[in-house]
Structure formats: structure tokens, C-alpha cells
């Protein structure tokens, strides 16, 4: 374990010394708790930099998908992966590649048409012509196929799709370079960019060694665990073609793909999950424009359960259990009969029922504001001091 010194920017003197491992763990925990970008590994970032002769990559945008030279920018576009699954769960590779090709061309056109916030950003963006094509709803695809998000098969599938997207985008960029010429900054960086392309090619073939000028070896494509051999074969062939075309014509764009969080556009695109992320909650509360909320379940849950072999009846029961019935009538455990046995009259039960649609948790319904303080103290026998405790749980008090 080594110490890490923090130095003052004013005079470069040591301000504090911290254990490096402890500091790393604190940063990792903070990134995990906040779900915001954490540490950026500068060495690896610059080892895969396509234009190192034009300067180092020093930072990223706030969401951390775009890493390139200072004073550059890229337009973003994302594809909804779920739209490429057919009814049998087979991924439509040719349609996906067509969409990637079409959007790569569209984004290239947008470089010329875009407006930038400063002269420097405009000039450098025209010079390097970076693009930002990505995808969303990976979690939805995995759910639809009944695959655990944290599994070797899921990682292999995600790696294959990403390799196909990036390889196809760079291949399209090389084809555009044949017609339009390479980006202006390519000549100064040709050998380095081709080196990066060859490293991508090796990774797509699942090769574990032989990489060029990398400080840390990458995790190559897991060919054996990919559930669809057509995906890995396509990833390999498209990267072979990309490298060959790049040798002949160069590339129209210094970068072509990023994977953004898609927190906003993912909703517009009707995605069940955003970016590469799993679903943060299978059941969510949707706020209504006229007031109030209603519960919705991820639409992929029934499809995932069917893929896992559950019968239609079992799927229906599981969905009802997850979403809830919206009423205590006939519910297991906490129902009208059980409440009447505890002293609840019909008026109190009606007040509970009226509060259920807006409740995020059933515990939030059982409180003195819904039932009335007098009812809680005189009928249910709850001491006033107990009722005023911040962590008081009425359901536990009632024996549920």
C-alpha cells in the first residue's frame, strides 16, 4: 500500500498524505452511490486514443461517454436495441448494421450543419469530425431473452453487439473517406489510428495477446459464451473489413461511437432500460398530469418470464404480485377481514382504500393522518407518545 500526496495548486507543496488504497475505495464507493462518473483511467484512455499526435485526452463530457481532444464535440444518436429482436428472440444483424450505417452517414452530415458554441470548438470539430452513435435498452434485450444481466452470456452478447456497432460505423467512415477524403487531422495520426483499429480487430477475434502499445490488456470478446454465434462471426468479419478499408482510404471521422446514458432520449424512444444499464426498478410509479400516480411494471417482465418457461397463468400471478392489486379487498395477509379483527370499522377501511393509489409503500397508508389521531389512540390503543415517534411502524404495532 502506497501513500498518495495531495499538493496545493498555488505552490505545489504537500497539503495532505493519504493511503492510496483507502482513497481509491472511497472514490469507487462515491461513484457507486451517486451513479455518476467516477475515476477516469487516463493511461488506458490515451492508449486507445485515435489521434494522440494532436494532443492528449484530458477529460470527458459530464456523462463521460465522449473522450477526445479539448475543444471538440460530437452529436449523439442512439439505437433502441430491442427493436432489432424478432418474435423468436433472434437479433436481426443485417437490419442493425443497416441502421448503424445510415446513422453514421447522418451524423457525418450533421457535423457540417451543426452550430458550435465557440470558434475553437467549431474548427476542431470540423478538423476531427467525431461522431457519437450508441445504443440503448440493452437491459430490455437481456430481459426479453431471459438472460441475467450479471452473467457471462450477457456480457458476451453485449460485447458482440458493441463490436458490430463500432466496427460497422468505422467501416462506413472508411467508405465515406474513399469518396470524401479522410478527416483533416488524419494524416498526422494515421499510423496511431490504424494501430487502435488493429487492437479493436484483435479484441473482436477474442485474442488475449499481441496488442500494440497498450499498458493494460483489454478483455477480448468472449466468443465461447455468446449465445448467438452469428453475432461473433459478424463482429470479426466487420472488423477485418474495417481495418482493410482503413489502410486504403483512412477514415472520415476520428471517432464514431459512444454509449451515452440516454436518460432523456431513452424515454422518448420508448426504451424499457437506458443505455447499457439494467433496470433500476421493475415496478415504477408514473406521475399523472392531472395529479396522482399509478404503478407500472417493466414491459419486459412478462416476456422474460415467458422466455424462462413460466406458464401464462403464473406470469399473470407474478405480475399482479409485483404491481399489487390496488386494493386491500381479498389481499393476502393485510385485508378487510384481518383489519376488522384489529378494530378497523368500514369508515377507516374506506380511508385506507382511498389513500392506496398514491402510496409508494403500504406502510405510508397506515398513519395518524389517514386514520385520524383519535381513532389510532382510542380504537387501536396506540399510546400518543408512540404515535409521535418518527420511526413508528403501525403495521408492526398491529402485528402484521
Task: Go through each PLM region and give its residues.
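Long, C-terminal-biased catalytic regions of enzyme "large/alpha" subunits
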Residues: 1-400
